[in-house]
Amino acid sequence: MLVTELIKKARIEPLVFYNRYNNLSEFYDDFVKNYDYWFKDVTTGIKFPTDSKLGYISILKNLQKELQEKSVMLELLRWEIAEKNETTIRTAMLREMHALPLVEAYEEKYKDTDIVAMSALIIGGIYYLNLHKDRYKFADIDLQTEVGQKRIEKALESLGEMIFQHQELEDYKHTVAEKMKENGISEEIIRKCLV
């Protein structure tokens, strides 16, 4: 977008813009600083420990809701994908840094599940569905409707359940293996039984 387009869209005088900013990049930089720390909004107000199953599901649902309701976030993501500059690189890095403590908590607690990679796929899907919603339905799901939104919300709940069921199964197998070992059952038999 050119400065002249921005000034027209914002309905401000060029002098007002140039008194505050030297160029469009400076404006974008300032704009992003005000709007891009939305990840904390996603985790605020969660009633469950953020490193629990219900906390995880709540984070995914809140992310979907925030992107559904706040088009500014979508525009920032769209810009980040479309252009590579200092501002877009920095905001991508900052978003990653804000998420890092949460990622590390899940990674530590759920070692047998690559929850980080699974989460990356889910979050990427949430981003894409929301970026795409103004174009057309995706997989016959229309995020512009309440029905479509509810379907995605339910799917996020199901995905969260599946991820944690896998971890619970791994934990159970580990407990059973330990008890079998305590009762003198060989490693080979334990492996055959639990694979």
Regions found by a protein language model. Name each.
Residues 28-35, 91:
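Alpha-helical DNA-contacting segments of helix-turn-helix folds
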